[in-house]
């Protein structure tokens, strides 16, 4: 085992910008050892398309790098494609390749080979088109690590937003917000802010579900019947929670100035504000896993693959956050 465990980078959808991100990142020397789990042939082809001269160095279970690669160099754990890739053109035959890169990364973290995973975007649709049920990175890694409950959190400079519910139709959100779910999510958020972000006593702002946080029950009773009593019980466990507050006033400097995270009830309640504040410089973090996993905050951008018009800002933030969470910063 090397003295400094490497982090691993999975490029996601091979026809998207994930391979481009890996190569563009490799132009700079990295502060920590970093291995891309990808097809070496794909990276070589994409580098040629981008006009980049990047040395691809082999890495694998018998020879993990213990030192960072220099500029214009990338360590690669070669993972074969099922079929050749054309930038921007999806092919379901490569769905198993995408999942194999994630499986290698997750298992390597579990056995102690890797310090953390940074993921580039996958295309859920083409994986499902291949006949493989797939909801996303978060659910896949939760199953791989035998984790019952995980929490999605996005972060940018000065703001962290975690979600009680994630990819649900809006009509199903209220029913999904149960006392049990709210307890589990809040406990995971609090625990990981302490253990992975080094915040001794996190201060968490909690959004209400309804406009004006229910207006005393006139605009919905979820705050009165579920959210408020659940938060009261969690406060007795020593968790510092403020709310439920109306989301339209919670996301103002007055409230955000002294908080460590916001807990939003649903996807589009919290994430538009965060993405407006930090799009291109935000990171997606999976809380509750026994491993460190961060991701970029954008999609596969098939139309930009192979063009060189790709911003690596979100990937850099994802790397920095993974280093921080693992104690390697």
Curated annotation (Swiss-Prot):
Domain of life per record? Bacteria
Which keywords describe this protein according to UniProt?
Cobalt, Cytoplasm, Magnesium, Metal-binding, NAD, NADP, Oxidoreductase, Pyridoxine biosynthesis, Zinc
**What does it do?**
Catalyzes the NAD(P)-dependent oxidation of 4-(phosphooxy)-L-threonine (HTP) into 2-amino-3-oxo-4-(phosphooxy)butyric acid which spontaneously decarboxylates to form 3-amino-2-oxopropyl phosphate (AHAP).
Family note: Belongs to the PdxA family.
Q: What is this protein called?
A: 4-hydroxythreonine-4-phosphate dehydrogenase
Coiled-coil stretches noted in the UniProt entry, renumbered to this chain: none
As recorded in UniProt, its EC number(s) are 1.1.1.262
Give the UniProt subcellular location, in the record's own words: Cytoplasm
Question: Where does the chain bind substrate?
Answer: 137-138, 275, 284, 293
Residues spanning the membrane: none
GO BP: pyridoxal phosphate biosynthetic process; pyridoxine biosynthetic process
Gene this chain is encoded by:
pdxA
Q: Which GO terms describe its molecular function?
A: 4-hydroxythreonine-4-phosphate dehydrogenase activity; cobalt ion binding; magnesium ion binding; NAD binding; zinc ion binding
Assembly and interactions?
Homodimer.
What is the catalytic activity of this protein? Answer: 4-(phosphooxy)-L-threonine + NAD(+) = 3-amino-2-oxopropyl phosphate + CO2 + NADH
Where do the annotations place a divalent metal cation binding? 167, 212, 267
Query: What does the entry list under GO cellular component?
Result: cytoplasm
Further remark: The active site is located at the dimer interface.
Q: What class of enzyme is it?
A: oxidoreductase
Cofactor(s) for this protein? Zn(2+); Mg(2+); Co(2+)
Provide the cofactor note recorded for this chain's UniProt entry: Binds 1 divalent metal cation per subunit. Can use ions such as Zn(2+), Mg(2+) or Co(2+).
Q: In which pathway does it act?
A: Cofactor biosynthesis; pyridoxine 5'-phosphate biosynthesis; pyridoxine 5'-phosphate from D-erythrose 4-phosphate: step 4/5
């Amino acid at each position: 085992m090397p003295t400094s465990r490497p982090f691993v980078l999975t490029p996601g959808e091979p026809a998207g910008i994930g391979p481009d991100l890996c190569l563009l990142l490799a132009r700079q020397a990295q502060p920590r050892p970093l291995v891309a789990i990808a097809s070496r042939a794909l990276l070589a082809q994409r580098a040629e398309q981008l006009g980049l001269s990047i040395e691809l160095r082999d890495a694998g279970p018998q020879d993990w790098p213990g030192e960072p690669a220099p500029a214009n160099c990338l360590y690669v754990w070669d993972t074969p494609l099922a079929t050749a890739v054309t930038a921007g053109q999806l092919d379901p035959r490569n769905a198993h390749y995408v999942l194999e890169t994630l499986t290698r990364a997750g298992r390597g973290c579990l056995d102690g080979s890797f310090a953390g995973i940074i993921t580039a975007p996958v295309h859920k649709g083409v994986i499902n088109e291949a006949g493989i049920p797939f909801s996303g990175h978060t659910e896949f890694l939760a199953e791989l690590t035998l984790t019952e409950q995980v929490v999605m959190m996005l972060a940018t400079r000065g703001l962290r937003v975690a979600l009680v519910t994630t990819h649900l139709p809006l009509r199903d959100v209220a029913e999904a917000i149960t006392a049990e779910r709210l307890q589990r999510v809040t406990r995971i958020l609090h625990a990981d802010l302490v253990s992975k972000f080094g915040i001794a006593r996190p201060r968490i702002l909690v959004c209400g579900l309804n406009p004006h946080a229910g207006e005393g029950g006139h605009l919905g009773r979820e705050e009165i019947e579920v959210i408020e009593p659940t938060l009261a019980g969690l406060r007795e466990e020593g968790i510092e929670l403020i709310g439920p507050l109306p989301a339209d006033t919670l996301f103002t400097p007055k409230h955000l100035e002294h908080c460590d995270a916001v807990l939003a009830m649903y996807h589009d309640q919290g994430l538009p504000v965060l993405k407006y504040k930090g799009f291109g410089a935000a990171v997606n973090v999976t809380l509750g896993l026994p491993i460190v996993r961060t991701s970029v905050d954008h999609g596969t951008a098939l139309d930009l693959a192979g063009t060189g018009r790709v911003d690596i800002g979100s990937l850099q933030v994802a790397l920095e956050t993974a280093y921080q969470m693992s104690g390697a910063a």
